[in-house]
A protein has these predicted regions:
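Bacterial Sec-dependent N-terminal signal peptides
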Residues: 1-28
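Short N-terminal segments immediately surrounding and downstream of signal-peptide cleavage
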Residues: 23-46
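Acidic/histidine-rich, surface-exposed loop or edge segments in extracytoplasmic proteins
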Residues: 25-32, 92-106
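Short, contiguous alpha-helical
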Residues: 38-42, 46-49, 59-102, 142-190
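Well-ordered alpha-helical scaffold segments within catalytic/enzyme domains
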Residues: 47, 51-52, 86, 123, ...
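Residues within well-ordered alpha-helical secondary structure of globular protein domains
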Residues: 54, 77-80, 119
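Surface-exposed helix-capping loop/turn segments at secondary-structure junctions
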Residues: 54-61, 128-137, 175-180
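Acidic/histidine-rich alpha-helical segments that form the ligand environment
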Residues: 105-142, 149-162
Length: 190
């Protein structure tokens, strides 16, 4: 019985010590989550521009191996997917790049890639800022496969997708003997 009383007393003391800290924790509002998403898109844009500026213009056609996309094609794919996923998530009209920019040789110059990529990020930032939070829980049927996701999931998948393809281009830059940009996990380079 003495052990039980000591255990209960210890538990209550511990709980009373910890509870004030727990009760002061603040829940995130949907507006906070939306603001963080906008911040993440702004950071992702800056980070991707670092990548575009790091790769020399004459190396945009470089492929790590013949069977994969070139650096320019990776970035153009990223840009078109940004537009597709964010427009699907938000229903906000996106700029039209035409189809398969990554297969167009004229789109693969450094200046063209920079234009398409920055335009796509500007759209994503605007779409995130102007998305209707009250609709984030709605399910959307994807126009391929048999997939259905919430708008919020699509917003997150858009961020995930661009990070994946930007990350793939790290090896392209390294194979040129160039150090890739510092990570911008918390804003500036780390």
């Amino acid at each position: 019985m003495k052990k039980i009383i000591i255990s209960v007393t210890f538990f209550l003391f511990s709980f009373s010590f910890i509870f004030p800290f727990v009760s002061n924790a603040q829940a995130l509002s949907m507006a906070d989550i939306k603001a963080q998403m906008v911040k993440d898109w702004e950071r992702s844009k800056a980070y991707t521009i670092d990548y575009l500026n790091t790769m020399p213009a004459d190396k945009y056609s470089f492929k790590a191996v013949d069977s994969i996309r070139s650096f320019a094609q990776q970035m153009l794919h990223l840009a078109q997917a940004n537009l597709f996923l964010m427009s699907l998530a938000t229903d906000l009209k996106s700029p039209s790049f035409g189809s398969d920019r990554e297969k167009s040789p004229t789109a693969q110059t450094k200046d063209s890639v920079m234009y398409y990529v920055t335009t796509s990020y500007d759209y994503c930032i605007n779409a995130a800022k102007n998305s209707n939070i009250s609709k984030w829980g709605e399910k959307k049927k994807l126009p391929f496969g048999n997939y259905e996701e919430t708008r919020f999931a699509l917003l997150n998948k858009a961020l995930e997708h661009q990070a994946h393809h930007r990350g793939q281009t790290t090896i392209y830059i390294r194979l040129q003997g160039i150090k890739p940009p510092e990570e911008r996990l918390f804003g500036g380079g780390m």
